[in-house]
Amino acid sequence: MGNILKCFISCFDGEDEDGGSGHGRFPNSYPPVSSLHYQPLHLDDLQVPLSPPPPSTRQQQPPPRPALSRLHYQPLRLADLQVPLSPPPPSTRQQQLPPRPARPLGYHHGVLWPTIEITPCDDFLNLEFTTKVCEGPQHHSTPSRKTDLNRCIHEKDDGNSKPSYYWLTKNKDNHVVTPQTKRSPRPPSGVAALERDLVDFTRTFEVPEGLAQHVTSPMQAQVTWYRKLLAAYKDIKYPPKESADAAVLVAATLRGIERTNLEGILAFYGFPIPTISKEASENHPSSIPKGVLFVLKTLPVNAKCIVDGDGFTAYVDTLDPIELRQDCNASCQSRNSKKQKLWDKTAADLQISLENTGQKKMFFGGREILARKYEIRLRGIDAPEIGMQYGKESQDALVKLIARKCVTLHVYGQDQFKRFVCDIHCGGVFIQEQMLVNGHAWHFKNYDKRPQFAKWEKMARDARQGLWAYDNLEKPWEWRKNKRKASRHHNSDVR
C-alpha cells in the first residue's frame, strides 16, 4: 500500500518539472494555477467586431435621444420658408363673433364720440345740455381735461345781446382750476351785475365786494341773503330783465330784513325802491299783519314732510335771526300796561319755544348747516285728514304749492299740540288763499274770523271746486270729534 502512494506522488512531481507544458505523463491534465500568466484583452486583437449587449424591454420603447452637445439650434427666419405662414385656426368663440372693424376717427373705445351742442340759454341758472351721437365718423380731438359748462350770463342789460358761456376746468383731484376762456368784467350795476354775483356765489359762497359799504348786517347775514336770492332765482320761471322787476324780486325775497339793509342792497345794484300796487297790497300786504309775533324764513320744504293739507314740518337755518316784530310791540305801547305785559309774556314764551326746538344737520347750498325743526299748522283753514275722503287730494295740492321751495312763516303762536300756527307765503303767493279758492280746505271759523277767508271759501263752493264737488262731505272737525268719541267708548268697554 505504501508503494502505491509513493508512485502516485512521483507522477505529480514529474509534471512540475515539465515547466507547465502539459506534456507529462498525463497529457489531459491542466497546469497548476501558479504557472498561468494572464494578459489584458485588447480590442484591436479581435478579428470580429463586438456587438453591444441586447437592450432591455424598457429601453426598446423610446428611440435613442441624441446627445445635446451635438445639436445646433439656429433662429427661424421667415425668408427661408418657401410656404407662406397661415394663421392658427380660430377658437370656437372667435368663429361665432364677426370680425371687428378698424376703429375710425371720432370713435372712443369702439363707441361713437358724442358731440355736445351748446345752445343759448335765455333762462338764468337753467342751462340744459343736448347730446346727440354723430351719424358717421367725425374728426374730434380727445380733450386732455374734463371741462364743465358752468352757467350762462348776459353781458348787457338791453336784452338783445347773446349770452356768453364759460367753462370750469377740473384737475385729477376734482379741484376747480383757472377757467379755459377769459371771462368778461363784471358789470357795475343792473340785472347783469346781480346775476353775475349770484353765479360767483354758487362757486365761492362769497358776497360781492363793496356790499358791506351799503349794509350794516354782519357777513353771515349777507351770505344768508344771497342764498335766498339764489333760491328765488331758481324757483321763478321767467327771470327779470328790467331793473324794476329785479327790485320787486329782491324786495319780496328779503322782506324780513331791516329796511335800511334792503335799501342798501337796491342802491348797490342801482335798483329803484319798488312800490306795491293797491291790488297786491290787499291780499299780500307789505307790512306784517296784526298779531304776528315772529317771521321765519325756511329752507326748501321736503315733500315727505307735508303730512296733510294744513300741516307740514319745516327747517330753519340757525344762523337766521328769529325776528321779533317791533311794530307789534310798538302798537301795544299805546294800550294799557296789562295788555302790554301779556304780549311781552306771550312773545317771550314763544321765543323760548322757537329756540328750544330740535336741531338737525342738513346740506344746503353746497355746505352743511345746522337747522331747527318746526311743526307748522296753517292758520285759518282746516283740510281733510288723510283717512277722510278727499284727504289725499288736499295733501297733493299743498305739495304742489310749497314742495322744494323756501317759504316765509308769519308766526302767531302755538296750538294745544305744540305746533306753530302760521300764515304761509311762498314766492309772493298766499298759500291759505290758494287752498281755499281751489276748494282744498274749509275756512276754520272757530279760530279765524278774517272776512277774506270766508269770501275765498264761498268762491270755491259756488264753483263746486275741489271738495265742494262732493255732496254732504264730512267736515274734518266733526270727523275728529266722532273718532275721539269712538276711542273713549272703546276704552270704557275694555275696562
Swiss-Prot record:
GO terms for molecular function: endonuclease activity; metal ion binding. Residues 297-470 form the TNase-like domain. Transmembrane segments: none annotated. Its EC number is 3.1.31.-. A lipid is attached at residue 2 (N-myristoyl glycine). Its main location: membrane. Ca(2+) binds at residues 310, 382. It is found in: Cell membrane. Gene3D superfamilies: 2.40.50.90. Its cofactor is Ca(2+). Binds 1 Ca(2+) ion per subunit. GO terms for cellular component: plasma membrane. A lipid is attached at residue 11 (S-palmitoyl cysteine). The keyword Nuclease applies. Residues 45-68, 81-101 are annotated as: Disordered. The keyword Secreted does not apply. InterPro entries: SNase_OB-fold_sf, Staphylococal_nuclease_OB-fold. Signal peptide: none annotated. Residues 50-66 have a biased composition (Pro residues). PROSITE patterns: TNASE_3 (PS50830). Keywords: Calcium, Cell membrane, Endonuclease, Hydrolase, Lipoprotein, Membrane, Metal-binding, Myristate, Nuclease, Palmitate. It is a lipid-anchor. Belongs to the thermonuclease family. Enzyme that catalyzes the hydrolysis of both DNA and RNA at the 5' position of the phosphodiester bond. This is Probable staphylococcal-like nuclease CAN4. The lineage of its organism: Eukaryota, Viridiplantae, Streptophyta, Embryophyta, Tracheophyta.
